[in-house]
C-alpha cells in the first residue's frame, strides 16, 4: 500500500482536535483516514486521562475502530445531539464548501454534522481547491429504481458510474444503498445550485456536497494549522 505523504499532518490535526474533548461529551465520529487518526487520538486521551466519553460512529469502520480502542458507542438510532462532530473532507473551496463521501458514508456523516453543537472538519493542505469537482461527486442512491434514477441523473447532465467494491460487485453503503460517482461535470462553481437540483430527484438519498456552518482546520506539512469558520454554530 502506498504511504500517505500527509499522514503526519493528519496525526497532528487529530491530536489538536482530540485536545478539545472533555469528560461528559458525546462525540460524532466521521469516516476516512483523518477521522481514523482522530479516533486513535481520542482513545489515547481517554486511556491516559480516564475521560468519561461516549460516541456515535458514521460508518461500520469507524464503529469497529472506536470499539476496539475502548471508546463506548451508543445506539445510533437514539441520539439527538452530539457535543462535537469531527470529520474529514475530500475537497474544500475558498468559501469552505466541500465535497465529502469518498468512503461512501456521506448520508450518516451529514446527519452527525447536523446534530452537533460543534462541527469540525480536519483536512490536509492537498484538500484545498479553487473550485470543487476534480475529486468527483459521490451520490447515494436507492437500489429501487436504480436504472431510472441514473437515467434521470444523466438527463440532468450528471454522468458517472456505480461504485464497485474490491470484489467487483456493487459497493453497498451502511444503509443498503448504492453510490453513483459523478465525473461529469467536474467543476462546481455554484455547488448550492447543484445540491438543490440533485436532491429534487426522487431516489437520491444524499449528495456529497457539504454546505454547512462548520469550522475547518487545514493542516500543512510545515506543522501549521489554519483555522477558519463559516459562522453560525
Curated annotation (Swiss-Prot):
Pfam families: Rib_5-P_isom_A. It catalyses: aldehydo-D-ribose 5-phosphate = D-ribulose 5-phosphate. Keywords: Isomerase. Coiled coil: none annotated. The keyword Isomerase applies. It comes from the Bacteria. The active site is at residue 109. InterPro entries: NagB/RpiA_transferase-like (IPR037171), Ribose5P_isomerase_typA_subgr (IPR020672), Ribose5P_isomerase_type_A (IPR004788). Its EC number is 5.3.1.6. SUPFAM superfamilies: D-ribose-5-phosphate isomerase (RpiA), lid domain (SSF75445), NagB/RpiA/CoA transferase-like (SSF100950). The keyword Nucleus does not apply. Pathway: Carbohydrate degradation; pentose phosphate pathway; D-ribose 5-phosphate from D-ribulose 5-phosphate (non-oxidative stage): step 1/1. One of its GO terms (cellular component) is cytosol. GO terms for biological process: D-ribose metabolic process; pentose-phosphate shunt, non-oxidative branch. GO terms for molecular function: ribose-5-phosphate isomerase activity. It is an enzyme of class 5 (isomerase). Substrate binds at residues 31-34, 87-90, 100-103, 127. Belongs to the ribose 5-phosphate isomerase family. Catalyzes the reversible conversion of ribose-5-phosphate to ribulose 5-phosphate. Homodimer. This is Ribose-5-phosphate isomerase A. It comes from Chlamydia caviae (strain ATCC VR-813 / DSM 19441 / 03DC25 / GPIC) (Chlamydophila caviae). The gene is rpiA.
Amino acid at each position: 500500500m502506498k504511504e500517505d505523504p500527509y499522514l503526519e499532518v493528519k496525526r497532528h490535526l487529530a491530536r489538536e482536535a482530540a485536545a478539545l474533548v472533555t469528560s461528559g461529551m458525546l462525540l460524532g465520529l466521521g469516516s476516512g483516514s483523518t477521522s481514523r487518526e482522530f479516533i486513535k487520538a481520542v482513545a489515547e486521551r481517554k486511556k491516559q486521562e480516564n475521560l468519561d466519553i461516549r460516541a456515535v460512529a458514521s460508518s461500520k469502520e469507524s464503529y469497529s475502530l472506536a470499539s476496539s480502542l475502548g471508546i463506548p458507542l451508543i445506539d445510533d438510532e437514539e441520539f439527538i445531539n452530539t457535543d462535537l462532530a469531527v470529520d474529514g473532507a475530500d475537497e474544500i473551496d475558498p468559501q469552505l464548501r466541500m465535497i465529502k463521501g469518498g468512503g461512501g458514508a456521506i448520508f450518516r456523516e451529514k446527519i452527525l454534522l447536523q446534530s452537533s453543537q460543534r462541527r469540525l472538519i480536519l483536512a490536509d493542505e492537498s484538500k484545498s481547491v479553487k473550485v470543487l469537482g476534480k475529486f468527483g461527486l459521490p451520490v447515494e442512491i436507492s437500489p429501487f429504481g436504480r436504472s431510472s434514477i441514473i437515467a434521470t441523473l444523466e438527463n440532468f447532465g450528471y454522468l458517472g458510474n456505480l461504485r464497485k467494491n474490491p470484489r467487483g460487485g456493487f459497493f453497498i453503503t451502511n444503509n443498503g444503498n448504492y453510490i453513483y460517482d459523478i465525473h461529469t461535470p467536474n467543476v462546481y462553481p455554484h455547488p448550492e445550485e447543484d445540491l438543490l437540483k440533485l436532491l429534487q430527484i426522487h431516489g437520491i438519498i444524499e449528495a456529497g456536497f457539504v454546505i454547512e456552518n462548520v469550522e475547518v482546520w487545514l493542516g500543512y506539512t510545515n506543522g501549521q494549522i489554519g483555522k477558519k469558520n463559516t459562522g453560525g454554530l
